[in-house]
Amino acid sequence: MTNERTVKGVLGTKLGMTQLWDEHNRLVPVTVIQAGPCVVTQVRTPETDGYSAVQLGYGAVKAKNVTKPEAGHFEKAGVTPRRHLVELRTADASEYTLGQEIAADVFSESDFVDVTGTSKGKGTAGVMKRHGFGGLRATHGVHRKHRSPGSIGGCSTPGKVIKGLRMAGRMGVERVTVQNLQVHSVDAERGIMLVRGAVPGPKGSLLVVRSAAKKAAKNGDAA
C-alpha cells in the first residue's frame, strides 16, 4: 500500500510565545519555533520496506551516548549522531537523499501545518480541571463536595465502575497534535519559524511540524 499524500516536515524546539502586528494592524499571538536543522538518516521505499517514508534526525548528541546499533545506523547514513529521530510518511520519499539537510525554509509564509508535541505536566488533577466537569452547587445544601465528580456508577446495575470513566488522576505529559496552524513568517537565516497560535509543551520541548493533513484533504490531495 502506497501513501499518496506528499508531506513536508521538520523537527524543532519551542522557544516561547510573543505577539506581532499583521498587515491589517491586528495583534497576532505567535509561537516561536527553532526549526531544524534536521538531516535525513533513512529513506524507506515500497520496494524495500512496503511503504514510502523519510526519517529525520535532530539535535546533537555525543557519540559515546548512543548504542552500537544506533551508531551503525548513523554511520550508514553518513551523519553525526542525533538525539531525536522521527519518521514522516510521504509519497515523495524517493526524492530525498541520505545526509540531506532540512531546515525551516521547507515551509513558507501562510502555509498550514500540524504541530505535535508533549503537553505540559499538571500533576494530579481533579475532574473539573482534567475533564471540565461542572462540579456541584456552591451552596444550598452541598456539604464539602463542591468539586467532586458525583456518582461513578449504580450500586447494583451494573454494580461496577465502567472502564474508561473520567475520573481524577495525573494530567498532562501526553502526545498532543494541534492542527491547521498557519505559518506567520519564516526566518531562514536564523532557522526561526513563527506559527500563529499556541502549540503543546513547555519552552525547550521537542516539536514536530508537518504539512496540515486536513487542509490537504480539503484541497483535493488524497490522504
Curated annotation (Swiss-Prot):
Record bears the keyword Plastid: no
Keywords, sorted A to Z: Ribonucleoprotein, Ribosomal protein, RNA-binding, rRNA-binding
Taxonomic superkingdom: Bacteria
Database matches in SUPFAM superfamilies: Translation proteins
InterPro entries, sorted: Ribosomal_uL3 (IPR000597), Ribosomal_uL3_bac/org-type (IPR019927), Ribosomal_uL3_CS (IPR019926), Transl_B-barrel_sf (IPR009000)
One GO process term, biological-process aspect: translation
One Pfam family named in its UniProt record: Ribosomal_L3
GO molecular function: rRNA binding; structural constituent of ribosome
One Gene Ontology CC term in the entry: cytosolic large ribosomal subunit
Subunit description: Part of the 50S ribosomal subunit. Forms a cluster with proteins L14 and L19.
Primary role: One of the primary rRNA binding proteins, it binds directly near the 3'-end of the 23S rRNA, where it nucleates assembly of the 50S subunit.
Family of the protein in this entry: Belongs to the universal ribosomal protein uL3 family.
Protein name: Large ribosomal subunit protein uL3
Species whose genome carries this gene: Cutibacterium acnes (strain DSM 16379 / KPA171202) (Propionibacterium acnes)
Encoding gene (name): rplC
